[in-house]
Amino acid sequence: MRRKRGAAIRNCKLRGEWAEMCFAARALREGLRLARPWGESSGYDLVVDRGSREMVRVQVKSTIFREGTGYSCTMKDSKGPYKKNSFEFVAAYVIPEDVWFILPEETVRGKWSVGLYPKLENSKYGEYLEAWDLLRGELPGVIARIEACAEEYFPQS
């Protein structure tokens, strides 16, 4: 039902606001700490606090627009494609599939739109599908910390 509700919001501005709330809810479930800038002139929608005085800016985008077997997601503001250092990540919500792409800024910089293919293996942006670890500052496939405990084992005869 949630997918249909978001897609049913025809006003792009309202759908964008709804997507920002969806991002905040999901980010909190992922254990991320969020802050929101005051006003709408920042060039990004939310801030993820990574701790240790490190924060990253996130621009939230959403799409319902089919493009073949995927979706086209606009990557621009009212002035054109996003410029360098506007934010660190784009969180792109593919509403009909209920999935997120967490895209580093350099992958979308200067582009008018990107094609997102959640069901296609080896797609251009496939490595960023549900890549919430990037917002935490973790590298995919890298174990940041391991904790273990062991006891001596003496088999009974």
Question: Where are the language model's segments positioned?
Answer:
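Mixed-charge (Asp/Glu-Lys/Arg
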Residues: M1-S42, V47-S157
